[in-house]
C-alpha cells in the first residue's frame, strides 16, 4: 500500500519514554518490532490524523524499524499487543511513584515564659501576660465578680507556686503589677455572650459507694448539730425592734449566749467529719479558728425568712434586721442579710449546706498549717461529693456547682469583717467578752486578741498566730481538746 505524497507533520512525542529517539507518528514506543500489524491509530487526543495525512502501512513501519534499530532481531520474535503497551506504561508510572518525597519538618513546639504571677508553667498569654491556668482563672473570677479581698498580714505576701492560694489580696495585686488587664477580661466576657449558647450538658454523674457514705455522714453531722427552721418553735422579742442603737445589752447577752452554743455545735460537727481528728491538734485548732465564723454566718443565713426579713437562732429566737444590728452585728448586719438573699435562689438543702461547711473548714490554704498537703487531700473527696450531688439534684443546671462553691469567697470576705467587729465589740460591752467567742472568732485567720488599751488601727494587729503560740495561750482548754 502506498502512502500519501503530502508531507505529514510529526508531533513531538512526550511522555515516559523520552530517552528513546523520536519516531514517526503515530509510534509512541521504540520501533523495535519488525513486521508488526497495528490497527489504525488516532491522534494523541483521540482524534483522527489531519487531512492529507495517512496511517503508515506495516511495510513502512517495518522499514522505519530497520532504520531506527539497525535490524534488531528482538522484533522478529515479539508480537505487539495492547497488553504490552499497558504493561510498559504501568511499569513506568510505578517507577515514579516509588520515589518517596522528603517529609516536611515539624514546627518546633511553642515555649512560653513561666507564669508572671506565680512562676508556674505557663499555658499561654492571658489578659496581656504569660500566665498559668490557675492565675488566669483567679484573675478572671476576681474581675468578673468584683471581688474585694483582705490581706491579714502586711500586704506584701510572697506569691509563688506554693503560696499563691494563701493570700488572695496579694495575688490579685501581683496580677495587676505584672500587667494583667481588666479590659481584656471584660472584652472576653462580652465576646462569649455573643457566641451561640451550647447544648446543655447531658453527662450523667454517679456517686461511688465511698462518696455516698461520706455524703451521708456529713448530712447527719450537719442535721444533728443544726436543726432546720421547720424544727424550731419560733419566738420574737420587742426589744429595740424599731430603731437602731449602738448596742442593746439585753439582746447582746442573749445573742452571746446563743453564739457560744453555736460554736460548741460547730466543734462537734468538725469532729464528726471523716479524717478531721486524724490531723494534728494544732491543725485542728487552726482550721476551726479560721472557719468558725464562716460556718456561723452560713448557718444563720440558711434560717433567713425573706417575707419578714428575719433570722432565727437555734433556740427559736427570731430577730429582724434592726434587732440583729442592735444585738451586736452592727455594720456587719447588711452584709449578712445581703448574703442571705443571695443564697435563696440556690435553694440549698441540708446535704449541700453540710458539704459546703465541711469544705470551708477543711481547706489547705489556711495560714500556719503544719500539714497543708494532708488537709488538701482530705478536702478533695468533699469537693467531688458536692459536685456530683449538686449535678444529680439539678441535672438541667450544670453551672450550679461553681455558683455554690464561689459562696465560700463571699463568706471569707464577710467573716474577715466579722473578726474586726468582735474586736470593736470588746470596747463597747461593759463586761468581758465570753471566752469561747473571743477564742474562736477574734483570732480567725490571724487576728491577734486586743484589749481596749491596745485598740488603735485594726490593720496594725493582724500578724499570724502560730499553733504553738495558740497552745501556750490557753487554747488547750478548748472544747476541741476535751
From Swiss-Prot:
CDD domains: NR_DBD_RAR, NR_LBD_RAR. Residues 462-482 have a biased composition (Low complexity). Residues 443-482 are annotated as: Disordered. GO terms for cellular component: cytoplasm; nucleoplasm. SMART domains: HOLI, ZnF_C4. The modification Phosphoserine is found at residue 104. A zinc finger (NR C4-type) spans 115-135, 151-175. Disruption phenotype: Rarb and Rarg, but not Rarb and Rara, double null mice exhibit growth retardation 3 weeks after birth. Defects are found in the growth plates with deficiency in cartilage. Growth retardation was noticable in limb sketal elements such as femurs. Early lethality and male sterility due to squamous metaplasia of the seminal vesicles and prostate are also observed. Isoform 2 mutants appear normal. GO terms for molecular function: DNA-binding transcription factor activity; heterocyclic compound binding; nuclear receptor activity; nuclear retinoid X receptor binding; protein-containing complex binding; RNA polymerase II transcription regulatory region sequence-specific DNA binding; sequence-specific DNA binding; sequence-specific double-stranded DNA binding. Residues 210-444 form the NR LBD domain. GO terms for biological process: apoptotic process; bone development; cell population proliferation; embryonic digestive tract development; embryonic eye morphogenesis; embryonic hindlimb morphogenesis; glandular epithelial cell development; growth plate cartilage development. Coiled coil: none annotated. It is found in: Nucleus; Cytoplasm. Keywords: Cytoplasm, DNA-binding, Metal-binding, Nucleus, Phosphoprotein, Receptor, Transcription, Transcription regulation, Zinc, Zinc-finger. Residues 1-114 are annotated as: Modulating. It holds the Pfam family Hormone_recep. Composed of three domains: a modulating N-terminal domain, a DNA-binding domain and a C-terminal ligand-binding domain. The DNA-binding nuclear receptor domain and the NR LBD domain are required for binding of the RARB/RXRA heterodimer to both DR1 and DR5 DNA elements. Homodimer. Heterodimer; with a RXR molecule. Binds DNA preferentially as a RAR/RXR heterodimer. Heterodimerizes (via NR LBD) with RXRA. Interacts weakly with NCOR2. Belongs to the nuclear hormone receptor family. NR1 subfamily. PANTHER family: NUCLEAR HORMONE RECEPTOR, RETINOIC ACID RECEPTOR BETA. This is Retinoic acid receptor beta. It comes from Mus musculus.
